[in-house]
């Protein structure tokens, strides 16, 4: 649980400390602290069949090293997910399967449990055993405040909340940070969502099997389409208005490389659509050509998406264009191919992405204004919050490149970055504004607030960049960036030479950069102040006067 601590003056000369997530005043020092009583939760693990997910020795590769070596930044790969060769997991004494997918840097394992809904406060007890012995275990994000006990190669802890918990390890107990190459495991803890048929809805059931062509292009409204647990091969699922897609726990959907233009799951010009899932979409057999997407919705009003696991995306993973009243919650994305951007909201209004875990081969979580949806929306009032993102190549949370329309009032709030690695580019970084398509377009009123970063292996933590390298005949290259605030940014550790912020304005770019504020940024233990603005170890000026007049540090 992410915690925000607020200091409140309650009486003259009397100061009381409140914890924001509980709303309760701390007792006086002389009183006995209140002990929170919880009950052991009833859990349901997400389990996939052996037909869908195999042990690594049962794959064509035959061993883990060769399986991992089948990665290609553009090409296809078989067996996108395997049973984890690294972990054995018990929760409340119950076996919970752990699965492993490839990432850009090594592999990433995952497990998922649903907690039965209860009116009482609950807990789950975790016992994780690893194939190797590690001296240190840190659960990310650190704001979850999980204390881990270690005994040889067994790691134990107690969890109290729906959240995303990633177990990371280091060989040395005294290591300053853990190592993302050492068997990271993300545990999704979510509330159980039993199927409930909406009033006056009919049902259509899709049994496991091969579904080619346009077999699953649905047109009947007021219908719940139920994907049964088991192994499916699917060319594409297209949803109509007033529909529910319910993907049962344990459903494994392998996308087929056919019916270009039809997403594995998608829809357009529709309204009132809900997707509830506890299943996997595997895009490992889909080639990269830009015409076949894992998940794409355009011009949709009232859309909610929850509970998907998407692996090995062949191109941009979850795309929402010109959508209004949108929620994207508790999804797990693990990909490594080039252009496998994670979650994109483009030209969306009243959108929210929450409690997602994203690790991809390109940008992680982003806002854009592409115009690709061909709708009338001007992006406004959207937020990403309580997400966890690791980046292996480009940005974690960004406003990236395609500025074809105006965009305003967008927020990244209460998010975390586990590990941020990028290609050797001086501007790619975890918190990134990088624009250059249209100098007449304004992106403004942008807020990054309460962002924690565990380890940054990039040239900079924050980039604000306007360039002119690709005008595309759309008003000339560049952008207008105005009123951006970075507030309460906390960087735990970074590589040598990493700076806090770099601002760049291209020599031939059009537009402007104005009103950039950095407030209360903790950079590897140092809180940055106005005096640090002139220190190039923290702030790099490649924007001339726009840096001098447009950036405020406080």
Task: For every predicted segment, state its role.
Residues 1-8:
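Positively charged n-region of N-terminal signal peptides that target proteins for export
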Residues 6, 29-229, 234, 240, ...:
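Extracellular "leader-to-stem" segments immediately downstream of a signal peptide or signal-anchor
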Residues 18-20:
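C-terminal motif of bacterial Sec signal peptides marking the signal peptidase cleavage site
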Residues 22-24:
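Bacterial signal peptide processing site
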Residues 159-161, 212-220, 232-244, 254-276, ...:
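Extracellular beta-strand-rich solenoid/capping regions of secreted or surface-exposed proteins
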Residues 236, 261-264, 294, 317, ...:
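Structural detector of coil-to-beta-strand junctions
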Residues 242-244, 249-250, 271-282, 301-312, ...:
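Right-handed parallel beta-helix
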Residues 422-554:
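Extracellular beta-rich repeat passengers
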């Amino acid at each position: 649980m992410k915690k925000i601590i607020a200091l409140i003056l309650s009486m003259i000369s009397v100061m009381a400390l409140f914890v924001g997530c509980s709303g309760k005043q701390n007792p006086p020092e002389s009183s006995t602290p209140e002990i929170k009583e919880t009950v052991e939760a009833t859990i349901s693990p997400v389990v996939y069949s052996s037909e869908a997910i195999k042990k690594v020795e049962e794959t064509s590769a035959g061993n883990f090293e060769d399986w991992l070596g089948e990665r290609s930044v553009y090409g296809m790969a078989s067996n996108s997910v395997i049973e984890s060769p690294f972990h054995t997991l018990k929760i409340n004494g119950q076996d919970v399967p752990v699965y492993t997918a490839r990432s850009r840097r090594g592999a990433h394992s995952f497990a998922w449990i649903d907690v039965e809904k209860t009116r009482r406060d609950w807990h789950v007890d975790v016992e994780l055993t690893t194939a190797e012995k590690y001296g240190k275990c840190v659960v990310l994000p650190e704001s979850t405040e999980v204390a881990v006990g270690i005994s040889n190669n067994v790691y134990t802890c107690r969890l109290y909340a729906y959240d995303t918990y990633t177990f990371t390890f280091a060989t040395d107990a005294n290591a300053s940070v853990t190592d993302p190459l050492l068997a990271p495991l993300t545990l999704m803890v979510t509330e159980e969502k039993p199927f409930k048929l909406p009033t006056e809805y009919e049902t259509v059931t899709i049994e496991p099997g091969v579904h080619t062509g346009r077999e699953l292009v649905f047109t009947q409204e007021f219908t719940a389409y139920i994907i049964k647990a088991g192994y499916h091969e699917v060319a594409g699922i297209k949803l109509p208005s007033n529909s529910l897609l319910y993907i049962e726990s344990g459903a494994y959907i392998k996308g087929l490389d056919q019916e270009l233009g039809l997403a594995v799951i998608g829809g357009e010009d529709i309204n009132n659509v809900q997707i509830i899932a506890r299943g996997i979409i595997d895009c490992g057999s889909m080639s990269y050509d830009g015409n076949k997407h894992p998940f794409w919705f355009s011009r949709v009003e009232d859309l909610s998406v929850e509970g998907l696991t998407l692996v090995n995306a062949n191109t941009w993973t979850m795309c929402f264009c010109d959508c209004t009243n949108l929620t994207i919650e508790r999804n797990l994305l693990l990909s490594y191919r080039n252009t496998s951007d994670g979650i994109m909201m483009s030209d969306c209004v009243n959108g929210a992405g929450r409690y997602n875990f994203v690790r991809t081969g390109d940008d992680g979580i982003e806002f854009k204004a592409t115009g690709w949806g061909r709708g009338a929306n001007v992006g406004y009032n959207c937020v990403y919050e309580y997400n966890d993102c690791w980046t292996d190549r480009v940005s974690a949370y960004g406003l990236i490149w395609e500025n074809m329309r105006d965009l305003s009032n967008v927020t990244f709030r209460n998010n975390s970055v586990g590990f941020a690695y990028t290609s050797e580019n001086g501007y790619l970084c975890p918190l990134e504004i990088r624009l250059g398509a249209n100098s007449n377009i304004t992106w403004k009123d942008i807020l990054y607030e309460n962002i924690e970063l565990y380890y940054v292996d990039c040239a900079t933590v924050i980039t604000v960049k306007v360039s002119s390298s690709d005008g595309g005949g759309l008003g000339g290259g560049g952008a207008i960036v105005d009123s951006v605030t970075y507030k309460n940014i906390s960087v735990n550790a970074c590589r040598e030479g990493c700076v806090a912020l770099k601002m760049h304005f291209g020599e031939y770019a059009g537009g402007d950069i104005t009103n950039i504020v950095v407030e209360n940024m903790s950079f590897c233990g140092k809180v940055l102040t106005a005096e640090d603005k002139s220190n190039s170890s923290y702030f790099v000026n490649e924007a001339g006067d726009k840096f001098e007049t447009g950036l405020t540090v406080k």
